């Protein structure tokens, strides 16, 4: 039952007209009428308390009406950012997300692989399946649960101060909803448990550098060379790529086929239309990560964020990996390079693989391309 319907029920049970309730409470007749008709769905706390006092309700009825007053409006909520028009090479991953029957999808991978772009594009494609709304929350920002409550229509004065109260209110607001939620930049399983919309009609898409648990889990790596060249062409124009396709392929290989790095390279070329593609290739060969910055996009900065969230031992091991003669590393070799025990080294390598700073396979661990250049710069 809605707040308005319950208010109408209690007013009639008390034998009061709207005018009489207005006189007792100090709330205008028009406001009472709007609330009862559902045109004003989330009254201010002082308005609610004035009506409760005027109706003379018992404590249980007062709590029920207070709870309904905190309920979110029924119109759809929307806070998705625009999606990037040039998302390429991710058709299979988009299909996996848009056809899943699970309530939770985790998209994980190294910095710069396009996790957020994929999640946002999928959310836009799924809009018609979630009529109650689509929400986007940056989990690393302050008070993500409080922000969710605000996005769901709860006024600041109705948000409980304690975390347990916020969680209970959040769960009550999700009940019966068909809503899609994107949780961007999740670090821990606890954040997923607290924030995910775990209701039968809801879907939560999580992006994370870590391999978090989920029934549907998608690992993003680099693009194929063909897709990376397609992304470059969408930014600088196909004419410049077609003029020197071999150099364009060389450029995306230098970028490690990372969507972020290719986008930065493309932006640099787009803002310098007289530059031949070869010129940027030579810059990257000479300066490596220092050449891959454009505006607020920065490959090195993305790697630094990944590294900063790891334990000190993992950071130490990564710095020592810049001394490697090759690209592969074992726990024994990492232990020798860092001056630590093999078990500690194994744990550190797993931590690095978790955030995409190392590739892991049955043969061990390896680092390539731009990540290798980053490690070299720290050695």
Regions flagged by a language model, labelled:
Residues 170-189:
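Conserved P-loop NTPase "ATPase switch" module shared by AAA+ and STAND
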Residues 23, 29, 45, 49, ...:
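C-terminal boundary/linker of central alpha/beta nucleotide-binding cores
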């Amino acid at each position: 039952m809605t707040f308005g319907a319950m208010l109408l029920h209690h007013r009639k049970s008390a034998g009061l007209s709207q005018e009489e309730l207005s006189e007792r409470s100090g709330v205008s007749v028009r406001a009472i009428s709007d609330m009862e008709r559902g045109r004003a769905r989330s009254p201010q706390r002082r308005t609610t308390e004035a009506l409760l006092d005027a109706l003379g309700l018992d404590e249980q009825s007062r709590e029920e009406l207070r709870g309904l007053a905190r309920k979110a409006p029924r119109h759809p909520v929307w806070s998705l950012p625009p999606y990037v028009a040039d998302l390429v090479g991710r058709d299979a991953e988009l299909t996996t997300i848009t056809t899943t029957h699970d309530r939770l999808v985790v998209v994980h991978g190294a910095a710069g692989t396009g996790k957020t772009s994929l999640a946002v594009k999928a959310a836009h494609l799924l809009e018609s399946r979630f009529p109650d709304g689509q929400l986007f929350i940056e989990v690393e920002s302050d008070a993500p649960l409080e922000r969710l409550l605000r996005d769901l229509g709860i006024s600041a004065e109705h948000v409980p101060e304690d975390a347990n109260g916020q969680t209970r209110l959040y769960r009550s607001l999700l009940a019966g909803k068909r809503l899609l939620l994107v949780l961007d930049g999740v670090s821990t399983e606890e954040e997923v448990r607290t924030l995910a919309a775990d209701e039968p009609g809801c879907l939560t898409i999580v992006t994370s550098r870590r391999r978090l648990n989920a029934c549907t889990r998608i690992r993003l790596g680099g693009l194929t060379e063909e897709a990376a060249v397609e992304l470059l062409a969408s930014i600088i124009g196909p004419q410049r790529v077609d003029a020197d396709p071999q150099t364009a392929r060389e450029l995306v290989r230098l970028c490690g086929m990372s969507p972020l790095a290719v986008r930065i390279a493309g932006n640099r070329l787009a803002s310098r239309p007289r530059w031949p593609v070869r010129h940027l290739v030579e810059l990257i060969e000479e300066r490596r990560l220092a050449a891959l910055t454009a505006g607020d996009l920065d490959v090195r900065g993305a790697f630094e964020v990944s590294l900063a969230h790891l334990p000190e031992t993992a950071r130490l091991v990564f710095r020592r990996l810049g001394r490697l003669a090759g690209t592969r590393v074992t726990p024994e070799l990492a232990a020798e390079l860092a001056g630590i025990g093999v078990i500690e080294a194994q744990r550190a390598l797993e931590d690095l693989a978790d955030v995409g700073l190392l590739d892991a396979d049955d043969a061990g661990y390896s680092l390539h391309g731009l990540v290798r250049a980053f490690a070299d710069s720290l050695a």
